[in-house]
Amino acid sequence: MAVKMIKVHGSGNDFYLLDQTQFQAPLSDADLKQLAINICKRDGAGLYDGADGVLVVDKSEHPQVLGRMRVINADGTEASMCGNGLRTVARYLGTQNSQEDFRVQTMYADLKVQAVADFAAHVPAYSVEISPVTFDAQTLGMHANNDATTIINEKIPALSADLKFSAVAVPNPHLIAFVDHDTLVGPELGRIGEWMNDGKNQIFPDGVNVSFVEVLGPNSIFVRTFERGVGFTNACGTAMSASSLMYVLLHQESTDFNQEIHVTNPGGMVKTVVHQGADEEYWMELIGNATFVRIVTLPLEDALQGDYSPVTATETGEQVAYEDFVANLAKA
């Protein structure tokens, strides 16, 4: 049986998009895990240049919803949400159904998505909702500071003597620290990220996404992320959304609710807007590219065994346009 996938990315956070409706019966969870582990390997061991994960598209039985998205990380674990991936799934479903404004089912919520103006020629963009938001330690799977119920801009002595952290789920868990530039690019993020995702630590036994954030100016931040199940990534959409929320809550001298925030990352740039509802619940808009790099086809049996010799691929040309867009960002 042949399997068709699309290599996609948002801000360089790259995935293989797999539409399960192409099969008579969906793949088992075990097969999805094995597929992700195989094709996502880097350093030439995976399919082409590997990926951060697999975006699994299925039909949804929810009303007014075009489809369902699941996220399988490169290590085979399942993530509850992926903002960058959601933009590419939104584009795929919108194109398939000739719609530009709809909802997509995710693990915890049916989220609003919408096509927006292209970032540049051949760089299509989408806006997606990031929610729900909670600071609850139990939901986060966090055990820190004598089992504090929340951690917002506080030191966690076991992690660092100097840095202050905020813990928030959007809905996947994030640990965020605002830092200076030297700390942003230094080794501390890798040390903390690896430790918090080793499966042995007692603070986040199930792991956590760790981000360092540098304030660049009014409504402008840089976010660098060590992603749970992936490691260092070019960008993490939920991390940039969570970082934007904490930026608004902790740095209102520089930004505020309902203002467009320019978020730079190692893979490019996105825009975010943080909203607060009447019931004081938060949600974010994540606005960024939804790039389709190539369409690949290969026998499923070979993909599950890590044999990519029979693969065929068609390049879309969009990656060149995206790289030009990023290069122009650097010149601005």
Swiss-Prot record:
PROSITE patterns, sorted: DAP_EPIMERASE
Top-level division of the source organism's lineage:
Bacteria
Q: Does the keyword Amino-acid biosynthesis apply?
A: yes
Q: Where is this site: Could be important to modulate the pK values of the two catalytic cysteine residues?
A: H174, E227
Biological process (GO) annotations held by this record are: lysine biosynthetic process via diaminopimelate
The record, for InterPro entries, names: DAP_epimerase_AS, DAP_epimerase_DapF
Q: What does this protein do?
A: Catalyzes the stereoinversion of LL-2,6-diaminopimelate (L,L-DAP) to meso-diaminopimelate (meso-DAP), a precursor of L-lysine and an essential component of the bacterial peptidoglycan.
Name the family.
Answer: Belongs to the diaminopimelate epimerase family.
Q: What is this protein called?
A: Diaminopimelate epimerase
